[in-house]
From Swiss-Prot:
It comes from Staphylococcus aureus (strain Newman). This is 4,4'-diapophytoene desaturase (4,4'-diaponeurosporene-forming). Homooligomer. The monomeric form also seems to be active. The gene is crtN. It is an enzyme of class 1 (oxidoreductase). The keyword Transferase does not apply.
């Protein structure tokens, strides 16, 4: 069969490879001039920067894409586990190194507060149990009809998840120490959600880091995008770049998707899998006479969106890779207040920031004697933060100064401004324009209870035959391992349909 995949982000690349490995003719259409989507790369002034995700969690999910296609993952990506997850800075002279080794982890916890290990381990155990339930009964399945969700098994297993509790409530139930609470709560920002609003299940990220480890891909995270692109090439997939999709064509008589309009041409296909940002697709790519019924264009703005980010890619003329960790977090003095600012639409003058120094793990990513630094500051998305003008150069200059002051929390960066030889910024406006991310959201639709599982945009269209959706704004959600799972379960359903002649 001829299959079209819209979008060459990590979801689209993974999905296309899985389909092609089953013997089908696959074409990927990508609007930009390179693959990867938000897993993007910037090469500038001799530096190589990952532009989007940077932390490799759940490596087995990465490997599975290749092995499911009958290939050896080691021929495409080089993975290695990190001994330390990150350094966390509460202040200039208050730093904690978070290890993966259990004995070292216990030492770290006891150094923060004697006796805290028991509560921390109880938290991890609770979350692990919830994760296993969620993975088996909710995350790794699709919901094609109401009875797939509304049944006794889902009711019983869902009750065990206690989804009415929020992430911060679960953390505070087990952890009294404020520093340790911060260590656990900030990671909900990895998928753009407010720990006060996100279901307690979304506190799984620290558990995944501790129990499955954190890894690094040689060449940076973009090495995964390159590996997937090579996998597709080896499987005979055709990738068309600079291919802007103008419309998904729906046959009104048979109510099926049978073509796409790309760069002015109508291209016929047997099935279409769309991995572009779902809200933008529902708003702009469906014909007027054939909207996605639950998500018509006029309702898209009313959905809840994850936060955005202000990113800086900085090159400095000194090598500091032996004085800093690969992954670092610098906390705001008022962490809770900063969370409120992000999700209430205000800019922070004392943000929590994430700092990634890739040359710590791979010297090839910076010129000899120099260092590349990636900084992420969570910000409101464009709807909540409608009063923020990201095109205002005075404003972006002010934000850069805030970030440089915050970076000075790390001793080696105290004089960073005098060493800068390269600087690039990426704003919420850029998320919207580059990736068609609605409201510049960095992680798609926010996974609130009302936008999760059965209530999230589904992988198999309920309105039109031969149309499928995958990616961060669809089930099961955002984050690289999760969108890879989205690709898998969507392709599984497509293959079942093909085998049944549907």
């Amino acid at each position: 069969m001829k299959i079209a995949v819209i979008g060459a982000g990590v979801t689209g690349l993974a999905a296309a490879a899985r389909i092609a490995s089953q013997g089908h003719e696959v074409t990927i259409f990508e609007k930009n001039n390179n693959v990867g989507g938000r897993m993007n790369q910037l090469k500038k002034d001799g530096f190589t920067f990952d532009m989007g995700p940077t932390i490799v969690m759940m490596p087995d999910v990465y490997k599975d894409v290749f092995t499911a296609c009958g290939k050896n993952y080691e021929d495409y990506i080089e993975l290695r586990q990190l001994r330390y997850i990150y350094d966390v800075y509460f202040d200039h002279d208050d730093r904690i190194t978070v290890p993966t080794d259990l004995a070292e982890l216990q030492q770290m916890l006891e150094s923060i507060e004697p006796g805290s290990t028991h509560g921390f381990m109880s938290f991890l155990t609770d979350v692990y149990k919830k994760y296993e339930i969620a993975r088996r009964y909710f995350l790794e399945r699709t919901y094609r009809k109401p009875s797939d969700f509304y049944n006794m098994t889902s009711l019983v297993q869902g009750a065990k998840l206690k989804t009415l509790n929020h992430a911060d409530q679960l953390i505070e139930h087990y952890i009294d120490n404020e520093k340790i609470q911060k260590l656990l709560a900030f990671q909900t920002l990895y998928i753009g959600i407010d720990p006060k609003r996100g279901p307690s299940l979304y506190s799984i990220i620290p558990m995944i880091e501790m129990m499955f480890g954190v890894h690094f891909i040689k060449g940076g995270m973009y090495g995964m995008a390159q590996g997937l692109a090579q996998l597709n090439k080896d499987l005979g997939v055709n990738i068309e770049l600079n291919a802007e999709i103008e419309q998904i064509i729906i046959d009104p008589k048979f109510k099926r998707a049978d073509a796409i309009k790309v760069n002015g041409d109508i291209r016929k296909f047997d099935k279409i899998l769309c991995t572009a940002d779902f809200p933008s697709v529902a708003e702009s790519l469906m014909p007027d006479f054939a909207p996605i019924k639950k998500y018509p264009p006029h309702k898209i703005a009313d959905l809840d969106y994850s936060c955005s980010a202000f990113l800086m890619y900085i090159g400095i003329d000194i090598d500091v890779t032996d004085q800093v960790r690969l992954h670092n977090v610098i906390f705001s003095d008022d962490f809770r207040g900063n969370i409120e600012e992000i999700f209430e639409g205000r800019l922070s003058y004392d943000p929590s920031i994430y700092v990634y120094v890739p040359a710590v793990a791979d010297k090839s990513l910076a010129p000899e004697g120099k260092t590349g630094i990636y900084v992420l500051m969570p910000t409101p998305e464009l709807k909540t933060g409608s009063g923020i003008d990201w095109s205002d150069e005075a404003l972006t200059q002010q934000i850069k100064e805030i970030i440089y002051r915050k970076l000075a929390t790390i001793e080696v960066f105290e004089d960073i401004k005098s060493h800068i030889v390269s600087e690039t910024i990426f704003t919420p406006n850029d998320f919207e324009q580059t990736y068609h991310a609605k409201f510049g959201s960095a992680f798609g639709l926010m996974p609130t209870l009302a936008q999760s599982n059965y209530y999230r945009p589904q992988n198999v269209s309920r309105d039109y035959k031969d149309l499928y959706f995958a990616g961060a704004s669809t089930h099961p959600g955002a984050g690289v391992p999760i969108v890879l799972t989205s690709a898998k379960i969507t392709v599984d359903e497509m293959i079942k349909d093909i085998e049944r002649g549907v």
